Regions:
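Charge-rich amphipathic alpha-helical interaction elements
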Residues: 1-125
Length: 125
């Protein structure tokens, strides 16, 4: 196997690794968006419930508002914890993707330089 073929294979491998890292980032971003959507829905439900509690005195006296707020707090805490974990994972994956991108670029540059040298050698008898 020639050096040029080895470089081409190296470039293909680094491209694949970068594509894999990019796919992982997309999945993590999808998870982040899902959690953020759930948090937004929870905030909307909180606003709606607050208006209902203001208009229905029976719900307040029955303690439904307190139970709702406790449940709401637990849900927010859970979702925010999950979001923090996803964001930490996203940051870790971004670092890996940056490294993979660097390798991909170096391999591509090495292939281009090898091709340029070969062309130069072919022109010079």
């Amino acid at each position: 196997m020639s050096d040029k073929e080895k470089l081409r294979e190296l470039a293909e491998i680094t491209d694949l690794v970068f594509a894999m890292q990019s796919a992982e980032i997309q999945e993590t971003t999808r998870q982040q968006a899902l959690i953020e959507s759930k948090l937004a829905k929870l905030s909307k439900a909180s606003e709606d419930a607050q208006a209902r509690f203001q208009s229905d005195v029976g719900l307040r006296f029955g303690g439904a508002d307190v139970m709702w707020q406790a449940w709401l707090g637990q849900q927010r805490k859970s979702l925010n914890t999950e979001l923090a974990a996803v964001l930490a994972e996203k940051e870790r994956r971004l670092q890996k993707m940056k490294f993979a991108f660097g390798r991909k670029e170096v391999a591509a540059k090495m292939c281009a330089e090898a091709a340029a040298i070969k062309r130069s050698d072919e022109r010079d008898p």
